[in-house]
Amino acid sequence: MAADGKNVLIMAGGTGGHVFPALACAREFQARGYSVHWLGTPRGIENELVPQAGLPLHLIQVTGLRGKGKLSLLKAPFTLVKAVLQARRIVRELKPVCVIGFGGYVTGPGGVAARLCGVPLVIHEQNARAGTANRLLVPLAARVCEAFPGTFEANDKLRTTGNPVRPELFMDAQRAPLAERRARLLVMGGSLGAEPLNKLLPKALSEVPANLRPEVFHQAGKNHAPTTAERYHEAGVEAQVEPFIKDMAHAYGWADMVVCRAGALTVSELAAAGLPSVLVPLPHAIDDHQTHNAQYLAREGAAFLMPQATTGAAQLAERLNEVLMQPEKLNTMAGTARRLAKPAATSTVVDICLEVAHG
């Protein structure tokens, strides 16, 4: 443990969308000489990623309340009080100069514990529509960071920072001019894959004229890659289908255009990489936050927003034809995406934390 005055406590859990931006900030804190500790829950992805990063992980017992039965709701106040007490014990032990929450169930009890212990609290919201925990913590926070403008009502605490993403994504890819080669299309469905996209893309690309049809790299998810590859074969479309993408920076650098969901981190990475996109938001995301994320790029012309419910193979093929026949349109969209990126997001968030810590 670092000497008093050099500990920072990060709260993030559940999904990679919360954890990866927090890890980027953890590395920045460490580069500035701070010891980073992590508050999480036993079931989230943080249990794999945080130890891999060499960071001490402290766990509290808390789960979400949405969609739970009446008995769980009756127990909720007692569960939350217990979680706050667990978090308070950890905060008292670590004596951090600052606590920053990136979302997930852990953030609520942890944020309350920080306030009870008199430790400055900063929250960071990755999505264009704020999560429940972050909305509730706004009154307790010393600073509120939003990735996308307009997520929170304007106030003196608010800072628009962007999402911390990997710095290698901001490097300019050296691609040959489109006039000299076929366009390259990257399809992503997240680590588990997106089966609606796995079904839609082979059909849509079969309707794109062969002379315009792009090279395709399709990340289909662990359980869906063989079936997706067979769909492409049956559609007469050549495609490289893989369950995972191990090197995202390389994949983004290879692509000219992306078809994917609209998670907050994905949207921020597309901007960082300067990539045009077709965004098909997850229709059942909480508070429809993926649609709001997608609008950040779509409003400015860096992406096409195509709702899953109204997007069939013909509609997607028409959109792909539109841009594949106009390489200059792809270039314009790419420039717009890059203009919307926030390359200083990580350092800005850390600056804000240390500002409130040492004030």
UniProtKB/Swiss-Prot annotation:
Cellular component, GO annotation: plasma membrane
Record's function text: Cell wall formation. Catalyzes the transfer of a GlcNAc subunit on undecaprenyl-pyrophosphoryl-MurNAc-pentapeptide (lipid intermediate I) to form undecaprenyl-pyrophosphoryl-MurNAc-(pentapeptide)GlcNAc (lipid intermediate II).
Binding site for UDP-N-acetyl-alpha-D-glucosamine: 15-17, 127, 166, 191, 245, 264-269, 290
Listed GO biological process terms: carbohydrate metabolic process; cell division; cell wall organization; lipid glycosylation; peptidoglycan biosynthetic process; regulation of cell shape
Reactions catalysed according to its record: di-trans,octa-cis-undecaprenyl diphospho-N-acetyl-alpha-D-muramoyl-L-alanyl-D-glutamyl-meso-2,6-diaminopimeloyl-D-alanyl-D-alanine + UDP-N-acetyl-alpha-D-glucosamine = di-trans,octa-cis-undecaprenyl diphospho-[N-acetyl-alpha-D-glucosaminyl-(1->4)]-N-acetyl-alpha-D-muramoyl-L-alanyl-D-glutamyl-meso-2,6-diaminopimeloyl-D-alanyl-D-alanine + UDP + H(+)
Family, as annotated: Belongs to the glycosyltransferase 28 family. MurG subfamily.
GO MF term set: UDP-N-acetyl-D-glucosamine:N-acetylmuramoyl-L-alanyl-D-glutamyl-meso-2,6-diaminopimelyl-D-alanyl-D-alanine-diphosphoundecaprenol 4-beta-N-acetylglucosaminlytransferase activity; undecaprenyldiphospho-muramoylpentapeptide beta-N-acetylglucosaminyltransferase activity
Bilayer topology: Peripheral membrane protein
Classification via NCBIfam families: murG
Name of this chain's protein: UDP-N-acetylglucosamine--N-acetylmuramyl-(pentapeptide) pyrophosphoryl-undecaprenol N-acetylglucosamine transferase
Domain of life: Bacteria
Known pathway: Cell wall biogenesis; peptidoglycan biosynthesis
Subcellular location: Cell inner membrane
Keyword field: Cell cycle, Cell division, Cell inner membrane, Cell membrane, Cell shape, Cell wall biogenesis/degradation, Glycosyltransferase, Membrane, Peptidoglycan synthesis, Transferase
EC annotation from Swiss-Prot or TrEMBL: 2.4.1.227
